[in-house]
Amino acid sequence: MNAPAKFSTSQIRSDFLAFFEGKGHTIVPSAPLVPGNDPTLLFTNSGMVQFKDVFLGAEKRSYVRAADVQRCLRAGGKHNDLDSVGYTARHHTFFEMLGNWSFGDYFKKDAIAWAWELLTQVWKLPADRLLVTVYHTDEEAFALWRDMIGIPESRIVRIGDNKGAPYASDNFWQMADTGPCGPCTEIFFDHGDHIAGGPPGSPDEDGDRFIEIWNLVFMQFDRQPDGTLVPLPAPCVDTGMGLERLAAILQHVHTNYEIDLFQALIGKASALTGITDLENKSLRVIADHIRACSFLIVDGVLPSNEGRGYVLRRIIRRALRHGWMLGVRQPFFSKMVPTLVELMGEAYPELVVAQDTVARALLAEEERFAETLDAGMKIFDEVASRSQDIIPGADAFRLYDTYGFPVDLTADIARERGMRVDMEGFEFAMERQRETARAAGKFGGGVALPADLVASMSPTVFLGYEAYDADALKVVALLKQGRPVERAEAGDEVIVFTDRTPFYAESGGQVGDSGQLSGPGVSINVTDTQKFAGQFHGHVGRISEGALALGDVLAGGIDTQRRGKTILNHSATHLLHAALREVLGTHVQQKGSLVAPDRLRFDFSHFQPFTADELAVIERKVNAEVRANHGVEVHNMAMQEALDFGAMALFGEKYGENVRVLKMGGYSTELCGGTHVTRTGDIGLFKITSEGGVSSGVRRIEAVTGQGALDYVADEERRLLEAANLLGGNTSEVVDKVRALTERQKRLERELESLKAKLASGATADLGASAIDVVGVKVVAVRLEGFDAKALRDAMDRLKQQLGDSVIVLAGASGGKVALVAGVNGSPTGKVKAGELLGHIASQIGGKGGGRPDLAQGGGEDGPALATALDGVPLWVKQHLG
C-alpha cells in the first residue's frame, strides 16, 4: 500500500512559484502550446521556448529573474512520445515543466543552492536519496555540489561526451549548432535498490531506479561557426523540472500515473467505460490524452487534416480507439472535460473559460470518427488475418484515406498484435496521392523574378495608404512573357515594376489594384497588381499605346471605385473575425480569406456547422459595430509592443520586427497590411450570403457589404414577393403557406405510396398465376409499367411468400429507364445466383447491377431488348439448375 500523498500536484505548483517569488523572481504565465512568432516549432515542448528570443538577444524583458509552470506537448515532429504513452511509467503527450530563469543575473552558485533548498528543506526530500551529474569539465559546478552543498564525491557523477564528439553530451546543452550553450547539472532521485537500474553514466542507467527530476542549464558560452566557445558577457540560467515526475516522488509512488491528478482522471475514465481495473493501459492513455487534447483546443488548435490540427486529431482518435477496445460505443471522451477543469482550472483559468468549446470540439470529433471506426477495425482485422507480421503500406494508406486512421494509430494496433506497418509502402502511397494533388492543382501564369534582378532592386515603396494616384514612378524592371526586357511595345502583355506605387499588390487575401500607368506617349492598362519575392509590386497589364523602356517615368492611378468596394469588404472581415470569436469562442482563427470588390470570403477554424440563430447573431453584431461608426486607427509598432497592445496575430505566421496594427474602436485589433475604411460606418451594411464547410475543422462565410449588400437584400425581397404572388398571398403569409403546401405534399405522397402498394399487391396476385414451372421451380420474369425500385422490392417480397421455391425477375419501366430486381427463394439458391442472373439481363439492355445470391438490383435502358432478355430467363434458369 502506497504511503499517503504528502504534497498534492496543485500544492507542488504553488510551492515552486512561491519559493522563487520569494527569491526575487517574476512569476510569468505559461505560454500557449502553439509557439508565438516561431513557425519552425510545432509545439511548445520545453519551458525555455517562450524565452528563446531573450537568450538570443532579440527581445528584452522587464525582469532578469523569472519562474513559471509551462504546459508542454511532445506528440509530433522531432519530439514525439505518442507511441510510448500509456505503456511506460513516465511518457506523456502533455506535461508541465517547472522552471526558474536568470537573464544575466545570478548564476551557478545561487541556482544550485536554491534547487537544493527547495528539494530538501521545503519538500523534505532525504539528501541521501539525491544524486547529481555534472559535465565532465565543469569543475565549478562539481566544487559547488561538494563544498557548498556537501554531497559526497561518490554521489557526484561526471558525464563526458558521447562517442568522443566535443560537447555532444547529456550534460551539455546547446540551442543550435551555433549560439548560446553551456554545461548543465542534473539532480536524480534514487527510488531504492528494490528497483532495477543503475546510476547515470553506468551501463544500467536506463533502469527506473534513478530518475532525473531537475536539470539546471548554465548558458555561459557563445558557440562560434568553427566550434570554439566564447564566454558570454552575461551568463544565464535555464532550469526545468517535470511536475509529474516530481509529484510521483513527493507522493511516494513510482509511476506518474499513480499521482493524484492522474488517479482522478483514470477514475473518471473508469466510470465512463465501466472498466474497474485502474492499471488498465487504455485508461492511462485516455487520462493522458484528455490533457493534451483539451489544452491544444484552449490554445486555438482544432482537429483537421494538416499541421497541428492533424496532430490533435491523431491524439483524439488514439484515445477513442482505446475506448473502443474497452467496449465503449457511445461518446465518452468529451465527458472527461469537467473533471479536468476541476483538477487544473485553478492553475490555468483559460481552461475554465474554454470548457464548453473544448467539450463541443471533442464531441464533434467523437461523432465524426464513430462513423468509420468500427468499419475501419473490420478492415484491419481482414488485412491482419491474411498478413503474417506486416500490415502492407497500401492497406495502411487505405485505412488512413478512407477510414480516417492516422498511420501511427494503425501502427499502435499492429504493435499490440505483434505486427508492424510497412511504413515505406505507406509513404509511397502518400506521395502518389500528393503528386496527383499537385498535378491537379497546377495552373499557368506563374512568374518568378530572377535572383540577379531581385538583388539589384530595392523594395517597392507603397504610397496607396494615403494616395490613389502618384507621379514620378520610375520603371526599375520590366517583364515580357515572364522574362526581363529593356523595352516593350504597344500590344505587349507586361509586368511593370516601379520604385514607388499607389497600387496595392495582392496579399493578406486582398486582391491587387487595377488602373492606369501612363507617361509621355505610352499608356498601360493595369488589370492586376501582384507581389513578387514578398517585396516588389508588379503591375500586370497590357501596353495600349506607345512603347515602354527601363528608366521611364510614369504617372499612375488606381481604379478608385474598385478599391473603394474592396476596402469595405476588408474592414468587414476584421469585424466578422471579432464577432466570430465573441459568439463561438477564442478557438476561432483565420485560415484564409478573399477580399474582392464584389464580396468577401472568410475561412476560419470551427468544428461544427452554424445554427441559423448563430449566423443571425454574428451578422447583427457586425452591423452594430458598423452603425457605431468607430474611427479606424492605424499604428506602426514593434511586434512585442503590438501584442502587448492587444493585437491579434495569426498562428503560424512569421512577422517582422515592426508591424502595422489596425484598431476598430474597442472591438477589433489585428495585425494587417491591407487597405481599409476610415470609419466603420463607411461599410454601410454587412450581409452574410452563405456559410459552409471547407474541410474538416474549417468553415467558410461569404458576405457582401455596402451597395452590394443593399442589392443582395433587394434581390431577396424581390424573390420573396415572387413567392408570395405564386402562393396567392402577401409576404407575411409565405412561411405559413409553404408549410401548408409541404404538409399537403407529404399527405399526398403517403396516399400515393398506399395506392402503389395496393397496385403492387393486385399485380402480385396476377403475376403469381403467370409463373412458369422450370424443373419444379416457379419462374417469373416480367415488365411492370411505372414501378420504381421500392415498389419492385415490395412485389418481390410478396411473390416469394406466395410462390415458395422460385426465381423472380421484375423490371420497372419509367421514362425510358428500367429498374431491375432479381430474387432467388428456397431450393434454387444453391445453383442460381441472383447477382449473376441480374448481371446477365442488365448486360443485354445497356445497364449493370449486382448483389447477394438471393437478391440483386440494377438498371438499364427500356426498349425491345428488354422483352428479349426477360423471355430468355426461363432457359437461363433451366441451364443453371442442370
UniProtKB/Swiss-Prot annotation:
Protein's cellular compartments: Cytoplasm
Record-linked Pfam families: DHHA1 (PF02272), tRNA-synt_2c (PF01411), tRNA_SAD (PF07973)
Cofactor(s) this protein requires: Zn(2+)
Source species, domain of life: Bacteria
InterPro entries xref list: aa-tRNA-synth_II/BPL/LPL (IPR045864), Ala-tRNA-lgiase_IIc (IPR002318), Ala-tRNA-ligase_IIc_anticod-bd (IPR018162), Ala-tRNA-synth_IIc_core (IPR018165), Ala-tRNA-synth_IIc_N (IPR018164), Ala-tRNA_ligase (IPR050058), Ala_tRNA_ligase_euk/bac (IPR023033), DHHA1_dom (IPR003156)
Cofactor annotation remark: Binds 1 zinc ion per subunit.
PANTHER family, per database record: ALANINE--TRNA LIGASE, CYTOPLASMIC (PTHR11777:SF9), ALANYL-TRNA SYNTHETASE (PTHR11777)
Official protein name in the record: Alanine--tRNA ligase
Organism this protein belongs to: Xanthomonas euvesicatoria pv. vesicatoria (strain 85-10)
Gene: alaS
